[in-house]
């Protein structure tokens, strides 16, 4: 008679900066109570391929991005920053930066990523010590590619704009921007740019100044500092992981054949190592039950295969807060997460 195969199961708890998951797995699966397997950094080869994506983030990728942003925000120290212009930024945690093309895209996004954006990341790692970061590629409404970057390093606006404009001008994007303005009439100037906040006289003055002094450096960078406002990390995570803008259009150079497997997002090795603190649930049953019963700031959802507890570590009661900070701090040390000064 055929003997039915059976195996023993056990309940596992997985703790992340914004949620706790309780689920069942086969017994003897490894948890973070045991040393992790040795991690190898694999060099890219010609045989390496990423999955085809049709220029859309998968649901799995969106979830991963949300989780990585939560880790980035939680591990980032809160500090005051003095910028290059001597401006003091109070309570800085992470920065959110956007890099655009100042003129019409003339190359595939894959080429721009490999020749320009990758060079930007290399220079930022070398010159600023950036180690913990995540980036995402998107299309604008005009079809141009642009990049969002989140990192725990403060990057001065003028500093990164100078670097980015120098790099993208290898492909002529700054020169074409200046040529466009050099040949622009006042009618074109008004039609191409939104000057609703300026009077007609101010528009003419701005246009004449541009004609005399040149267009200057294009505004190809946007900077947003993220401080300790309530749930701001959740906002950034949601923005980073959102689906593509339905009004955006892909430029004429990008096709599924030449760009269908290019990266739409990526994170540093330090964030890639952040998965969650896993332990056996029987060791934490009383603690989790008390957390659910006594802390009113949390939200609990019961799913078919797991239970999820969502929380904001800054809002939970002090007794639980100290425990979670200790667990996550020990995990940071356990995975050798790089510190940011």
Regions found by a protein language model. Give the residues of each.
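Right-hand nucleic-acid polymerase module
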Residues: 1-143, 154-341
């Amino acid at each position: 008679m055929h003997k039915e195969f059976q195996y023993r199961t056990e309940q596992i708890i997985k703790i992340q900066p914004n949620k706790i998951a309780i689920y069942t797995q086969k017994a003897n699966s490894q948890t973070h109570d045991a040393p992790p397997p040795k991690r190898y950094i694999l060099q890219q080869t010609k045989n390496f391929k990423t999955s085809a994506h049709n220029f859309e983030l998968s649901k799995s990728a969106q979830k991963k991005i949300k989780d990585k942003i939560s880790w980035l925000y939680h591990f980032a120290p809160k500090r005051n920053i003095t910028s290059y212009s001597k401006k003091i930024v109070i309570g800085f945690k992470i920065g959110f930066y956007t890099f655009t093309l100042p003129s019409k895209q003339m190359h595939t996004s894959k080429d721009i990523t490999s020749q320009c954006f990758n060079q930007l990341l290399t220079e930022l790692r070398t010159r600023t010590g950036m180690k913990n970061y995540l980036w995402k590629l998107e299309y604008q409404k005009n079809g141009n590619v642009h990049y969002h970057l989140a990192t725990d390093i403060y990057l001065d606006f003028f500093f990164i704009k100078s670097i980015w404009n120098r790099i993208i001008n290898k492909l002529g994007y700054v020169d074409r921007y200046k040529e466009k303005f050099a040949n622009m009439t006042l009618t074109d100037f008004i039609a191409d740019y939104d000057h609703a906040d300026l009077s007609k006289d101010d528009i003419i003055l701005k246009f004449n100044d541009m004609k005399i002094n040149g267009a200057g450096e294009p505004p190809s960078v946007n900077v947003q500092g993220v401080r300790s406002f309530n749930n701001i990390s959740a906002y950034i995570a949601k923005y980073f992981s959102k689906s593509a803008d339905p009004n955006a259009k892909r430029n004429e150079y990008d096709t599924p054949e030449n760009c269908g497997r290019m990266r739409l997002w990526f994170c540093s090795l330090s964030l890639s190592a952040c998965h969650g603190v896993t332990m056996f649930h029987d060791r934490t049953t009383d603690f989790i039950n008390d957390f659910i019963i006594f802390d009113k700031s949390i939200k609990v959802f019961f799913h078919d295969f797991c239970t999820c507890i969502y929380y904001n570590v800054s809002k939970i009661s002090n007794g639980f807060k100290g425990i979670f900070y200790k667990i996550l701090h020990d995990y940071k040390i356990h995975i050798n997460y790089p510190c940011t000064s």
